[in-house]
């Protein structure tokens, strides 16, 4: 092989393989700020590969700040996302008797900061007169509060997922630790703004670079995000356009594969 692509720094296959194939290794670490990346054992892992592929600028900055890899070639690219051509939000709303809602898509657990999302949303419902609901899609591994405005659908079909995202006021992602987030890119591809945890550099970066999302770091900023979406309709329309443009500009497969070709050529030289 001219090059061997190793994906995700955290697990055994990457840790053991990359030091053996380092002269041919292209490393896609999918790294984010978390305790594990600071373990001393990872110094050898991150300094081994010939080249890097980062999913975002924020990931690149993090890895370069932690390890001595300044001289290694790299490319920054995301991933492309594919959504159906025909999406029917009205069918989703009719099926589940929903109208005004925000949506969370993914594993419902503490690692994604879902308990804090529930806390913030219930506080919002106490403080703000609104018919807004929170719709959850995915496996719940933490308890979902019994609340009339929190709707947990469990696993759903791809059709329901995309219809549901398209019908939402926004997709919300409360996670503090993300290296990219496919669900955020899927929502933006469907011209749906996102509301994310601003503690996560990558998610905050999506919002800042696109002007297609909002971020929060505490309850009052969370409330402010939801109020803004509902109280500024013209700005909301522009956010929808901005979200789609961001994906079109930076997350297209043709561009991504061209970057892959370049980095593979560098490793093979």
Q: How should these model regions be labeled?
A:
Residues 138-163, 167-170:
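Nucleotide-activated donor-binding/catalytic signature segment of Leloir-type glycosyltransferases, i.e.
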Residues 176:
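Aromatic "clamp/platform" in nucleotide-sugar-dependent glycosyltransferases that forms part
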Residues 193-197:
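Short hydrophobic beta-strand element within catalytic cores of glycosyltransferases
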Residues 24-35, 42-87, 98:
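Donor nucleotide-sugar binding/catalytic pocket of nucleotide-sugar-dependent glycosyltransferases
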Residues 53, 93-112, 118-122, 240:
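Conserved donor-binding/catalytic core segment of Leloir-type glycosyltransferases
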Residues 162, 180-181, 185-189, 203-208:
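Short alpha-helical segment that forms part of, or immediately flanks, the ligand-binding pocket
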Residues 206, 228, 235-249, 259-262:
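A short, well-ordered alpha-helix in the C-terminal region of glycosyltransferases
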């Amino acid at each position: 092989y001219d090059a061997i692509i190793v994906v995700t720094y955290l697990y055994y296959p990457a840790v053991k393989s990359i030091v053996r194939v380092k002269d041919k290794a292209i490393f896609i670490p999918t790294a984010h700020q978390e305790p594990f990346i600071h373990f001393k054992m990872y110094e050898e892992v991150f300094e081994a590969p010939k080249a890097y592929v980062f999913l975002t600028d924020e990931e690149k900055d993090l890895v370069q700040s932690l390890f001595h890899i300044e001289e290694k070639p790299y490319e920054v690219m995301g991933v492309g996302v594919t959504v159906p051509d025909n999406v029917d939000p009205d069918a989703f709303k009719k099926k589940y008797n929903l109208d005004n809602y925000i949506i969370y898509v993914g594993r419902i657990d503490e690692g994604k900061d879902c308990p804090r999302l529930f806390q913030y949303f219930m506080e919002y419902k106490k403080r703000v007169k609104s018919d807004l609901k929170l719709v959850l899609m995915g496996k719940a591994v933490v308890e979902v509060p019994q609340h009339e405005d929190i709707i947990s659908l469990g696993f759903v079909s791809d059709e329901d997922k995309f219809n549901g995202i398209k019908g939402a006021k926004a997709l919300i992602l409360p996670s503090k630790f993300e290296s990219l987030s496919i669900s955020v890119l899927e929502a933006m591809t469907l011209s749906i703004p996102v509301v994310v945890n601003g503690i996560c550099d990558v998610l905050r970066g999506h919002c800042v670079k696109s002007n297609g999302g909002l971020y929060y770091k505490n309850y009052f900023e969370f409330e402010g995000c939801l109020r803004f979406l509902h109280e500024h309709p013209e700005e909301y329309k522009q956010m929808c356009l901005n979200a789609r443009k961001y994906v079109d500009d930076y997350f297209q497969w043709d561009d991504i594969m061209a970057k892959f070709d370049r980095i593979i050529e560098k490793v093979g030289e």
